[in-house]
Amino acid sequence: MTHASSSLFDFSPFAGQSERYVDLIKQFAAAQPFRSAEVSELVLDDDYHRRPLRPEDFEFLKFAKPVRPHNVSRLPALASNRTLLSIYELGTARLPRNANEAEWNRFVQFYSDDAQVLGAQIAPFLEAYAFEFLSRDQTPSADAAGLARILEAESLFWDQTFARLMRNDYLEEGLRFIMVQRWSLAPSKQRALARAAASGLFDMLPVELRPALDNLPADAALHEKVAASCGVTRQQHAYWQFYLPTSMAKCNLLYALARRPDRAFGLVGAAFAAEAEALAFSLALERACAHLTSANRGAGGAADAQARQAELLERASHALQSIGTAYGASAQAMAAQGIGAAERLCERARWDLGEQLLWLSSIRHYVAFAHRISTRIDAECPDIDRETFIEPHEMCSTTHVHNDHRLVTIQEGEMLFWGNVGMQHKMNEGDMVLIPDGRLHGSTVVSGECTYHQPIIPDEWVQALVAELDAKAST
């Protein structure tokens, strides 16, 4: 039994067992719905039953040391969150798109007994692996102060992010990537809470005190309008390959808690945090995209925003007090722990998204950095560690991240490179680009064959160049 005073997630029971679970993960990922992507699948044709997992990565990922705050954007976090989201949504019905036999087969394969059984075995391990850090060394307060911090931090982040995208002339493309993270994943978060409510996990609270992610249709309408304005119009999960690991983690945290009745109080806290984060984003989006806001919306401006935030904080405060009164200090502490875990994840997600958008919006600078680094390699360390690849026409890499900084340098052939929906950065012989540690990207070969190198770049080299970029931005 897990007591309210313990961590929400604990990897220690799985210590020394990683090899066994990796074997199960390999079996799960070997199924047809999870095979690596083909070049035509960069954006899926509204195929809910297709989830490229890059099974080849599980040949070298060990899952021995759980995720920590500093590596939330790296490959183990990406792989574990893609796998978890696939497992959780084996319990969500999406019917075949048509009567075609191949479509029916995809539908049946996705929900197969093998997938269900393997998923049930894998999920507790991956949850502990991916989420232990969220409540580790945490002493949350037993009130709603964490929600106020989330509202403030998220509001500041979004205002600064939209301003930077405008400065870098990347607003439309940046919004496209943002809406993939927000609008495309919103149904998963709502479904997690609906599943929890149907299972009675919110029954400790009266309806008027419960957290909610679908309580204002006007927000959903604005999100859909903004998404459509930048070309994000397909159903969930058409943009699967462009989800950041931390974006999926926010969905998965809700799913993980929602399937465990003994974590019900933790779910209440995490759900209130998800509502606070969503509210801060909606208000910031309304400010940034006022031209897409309906004429009768937001008439109160700042006063209306403040009222909505105050209502959330008051409702959450009453909910925590109600839990403490009815179920005791341990239950209230677990609810606060849920807020604290989500607050920590929100901070890491802001960092992850901010770094991805900085890289994408400054890609021309990272091309220039690559040439400077290449010159330095030739002068100082020509034998630097590197990987070389020779790939055939239409060889496609499912989007992925690296655990180090790398150059991509084309020796011969042509490649298309991307890190965002709609991005096609053409690379020919002699072209190169710097890919920082943890930045999501993919590519495909468009010539008959392509030979390219990936030198691994010391962190201090990259940080010095990024500091130049930061200095220019601040002047």
Residue ranges and their predicted role:
Residues T2-R164:
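Phosphate/adenylate-binding glycine loop and adjacent helical scaffold
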Residues S5, R106-D159, R176-V180, D203-G301:
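Active-site-proximal alpha-helical scaffolds that flank and shape metal-associated catalytic sites
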Residues R315-H365:
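Acidic, carboxylate-rich catalytic segments that either coordinate divalent cations
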Residues P382-D385, F389, G442-T475:
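Double-stranded beta-helix
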Residues V401, L407-E429, R439, V466-A467:
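A short beta-strand-loop-beta hairpin characteristic of the jelly-roll/cupin
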Residues F417-W418, H425, I435, L440-S447, ...:
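Short beta-strand His + acidic residue motifs that chelate non-heme Fe in jelly-roll/DSBH
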